[in-house]
Amino acid sequence: MKIFIHLPTWLGDAVMASPALYAIKEHFKNTQFILYGSLVSTALFREFPNSKIIIENKQTRYKQALSLRKELGKIDLSFAFRSAFSSKIILHILKTKQRYFFDKNKHKEEHQVLKYLYFIENSLSIKAHFKDLKLPFKLKFQNPLILKNGKKILGLNPGASFGSAKRWDASYFAKVALNFSQSHEILIFGAGKAEQELCNEIYQILKEQNIKVKNLCNKTTIKTLCQNIAFCDLFITNDSGPMHISTVYKIKTVAIFGPTKFTQTSPWQNQNAKLVHLDLACMPCMQKTCPLKHHKCMKDLKPEKVIEEIKKLSTP
C-alpha cells in the first residue's frame, strides 16, 4: 500500500501534526509513505519509517505533481494537512484513489494538535491511542555543541517565522539571560535574516557583559536544532516552531504569547511549560504585524514577569 501525505508548511504546525502522522502509521502497518512538503517540514520527518521524502517546489508545484504521478505510480490513499486550494489540485493531479483534506474551519477553538488528530480519526473512523508529540530522530547526547562545565543550559529563541508581532524584544531576552548567567550557559537559536539580527543583538549584549554564550542562529539543521533544544535545561521562547520542539522533549519552557491564541498553539501536554502573556483588549489579533502600531502585547510584557515564571519552574 502507498500513502501520500502533504505535510503542514510551518515547522510548528508540522510538529503538532506528528501525533496524527503516527496515528496513520499505526493504522496502516507495513505501508510505504510519501511525505511531501516544505523544506522544514520534510526535514523534520526525514527519518520517518518507510518513507520517501519529496520537497515541494512552490514555483512549479503542478508541473512537479505531474512528474510525480509518473514517478510514483498508483497511490492508494492521500492526506493533505494543508487546507490551501493548491493541495486539492496536487492530489487531483496525482489521481489518488481516496483523498482526505484538512479543514481549518472545523473544531476552530480546539488546540491545533487535536484539530489534526480529529482530521485523521474522522477520515479513517479510528480512535488514536497515541496523542503525544513525537519526532523520528534518534538523538545523541554524548557530544553537545556546548559543554556544561557544571552549569545548566539556558536556550533563547527570539524569533518567530509568522511575523514580527510574535517576537518579544531582544533586549528583554538578554535581560532574562543576564539574570540567570551565573547558573546557566546560554544558547541562542534562530534562522533567517530577520532572526539573525535579533540573535546578534542578544549575543552582543551578553558578550559585552562577559557572559558565556553561543549563537547558533543559521548554524543548525532541523535535526541538530532538535538535538540542541533537547539538551537545554530551560528554554525561553516566543510562540514558534522551536517552542513545539522543546515540548516534544518535555524541556522546562517559558512560552511568551502576544498576538496568537495560546489556547490553540500552546506547548502541548508539557507540564514543564509556563505560559506568559498579558490580557489586553486587542489580544489576540492574529496579525503578522501590530495593526495598532504600538505592539503593547509584547512591549508591556516585561522581563521581570518571565523571570518570575522561571523561578517557579525551578522550584521543586
Curated annotation (Swiss-Prot):
**Reaction catalysed by this enzyme:** an L-alpha-D-Hep-(1->5)-[alpha-Kdo-(2->4)]-alpha-Kdo-(2->6)-lipid A + ADP-L-glycero-beta-D-manno-heptose = an L-alpha-D-Hep-(1->3)-L-alpha-D-Hep-(1->5)-[alpha-Kdo-(2->4)]-alpha-Kdo-(2->6)-lipid A + ADP + H(+)
Pfam families noted in UniProt: Glyco_transf_9
Recorded GO molecular functions are: ADP-heptose-lipopolysaccharide heptosyltransferase activity
Q: What happens when the gene is disrupted?
A: Mutant synthesizes a truncated LOS molecule, but mutation does not affect the mobility and intensity of the high-molecular-weight polysaccharides.
Task: Give EC number(s), comma-separated.
Answer: 2.4.99.24
Is Glycosyltransferase set as a keyword in this record? yes
Keyword terms: Glycosyltransferase, Transferase
* Xref: SUPFAM superfamilies: UDP-Glycosyltransferase/glycogen phosphorylase
Q: In which pathway does it act?
A: Bacterial outer membrane biogenesis; LOS core biosynthesis
Any GO BP annotation: lipopolysaccharide core region biosynthetic process
**EC class:** transferase
Q: Which family does it belong to?
A: Belongs to the glycosyltransferase 9 family.
Q: What does this protein do?
A: Glycosyltransferase involved in the biosynthesis of the core oligosaccharide region of lipooligosaccharide (LOS). Catalyzes the addition of the second heptose unit to the heptosyl-Kdo2-lipid A module.
Its name, as the record gives it, is Lipooligosaccharide heptosyltransferase 2
Taxonomic source organism: Campylobacter jejuni subsp. jejuni serotype O:6 (strain 81116 / NCTC 11828)
This protein's encoding gene: waaF
